[in-house]
């Protein structure tokens, strides 16, 4: 088995996206919320590295995370453009959810811990302690992680259509650098009666 570092891509279909999940991806959090989420087991978000997080906006532009329109709003606006009614927000175990199509696909891109963090921080000494004593406010973001994100964004734009990317957020405040990409899965289908094509939002997976 090869020991070469490998990249990772995980994806999951969702019925919708809520404000809480969107806020986490876009880090629309204040200091108090960081403290609250860090009380949960297996969670740690370093607020002193929050300044390193970023998003890729339309055109492949790097900008501060959370400065663009909330993802849940972009989701509704894009569906309106397509003439598709958004699913109501329901819990996964709700029987009604089984009848709904997946209107969101959430991707997470990451890779080998050492490689990802080298791209993000270079040779800077980052303190990964989880006891709240770390101060990484002086750490700077490396260009390599930005280029990695832009390359991913370009690939997804070509594959799914840039207009269907409603969120592309890179997190450098956790253990390993990673990216959350949120897309609306649009396919064109031909109506049997009219022969006309119409957009359908659906992902089976």
Positions of PLM-derived features:
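N-terminal nicking endonuclease/strand-transfer module with a His-rich metal-binding environment
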Residues: 1-205
């Amino acid at each position: 088995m090869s020991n070469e570092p490998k990249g990772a891509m995980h994806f999951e279909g969702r019925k919708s996206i809520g404000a809480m999940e969107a806020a986490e991806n876009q880090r629309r959090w204040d200091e108090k919320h960081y403290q609250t989420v860090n009380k949960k087991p297996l969670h740690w978000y370093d607020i002193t590295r929050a300044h390193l997080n970023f998003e890729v906006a339309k055109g492949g532009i790097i900008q501060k995370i959370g400065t663009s329109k909330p993802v849940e709003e972009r989701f509704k606006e894009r569906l309106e453009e397509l003439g598709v009614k958004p699913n109501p927000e329901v819990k996964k175990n709700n029987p009604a959810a089984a009848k709904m199509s997946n209107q969101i696909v959430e991707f997470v891109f990451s890779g080998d811990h050492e490689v990802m963090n080298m791209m993000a921080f270079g040779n800077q000494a980052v303190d990964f302690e989880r006891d709240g004593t770390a101060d990484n406010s002086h750490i700077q973001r490396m260009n390599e992680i930005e280029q990695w994100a832009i390359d991913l964004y370009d690939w997804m734009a070509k594959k799914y259509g840039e207009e269907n990317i409603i969120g592309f957020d890179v997190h450098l405040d956790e253990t390993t650098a990673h990216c959350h990409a949120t897309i609306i899965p649009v396919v064109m289908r031909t109506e049997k009666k009219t022969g006309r094509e119409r957009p359908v939002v659906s992902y089976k997976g």
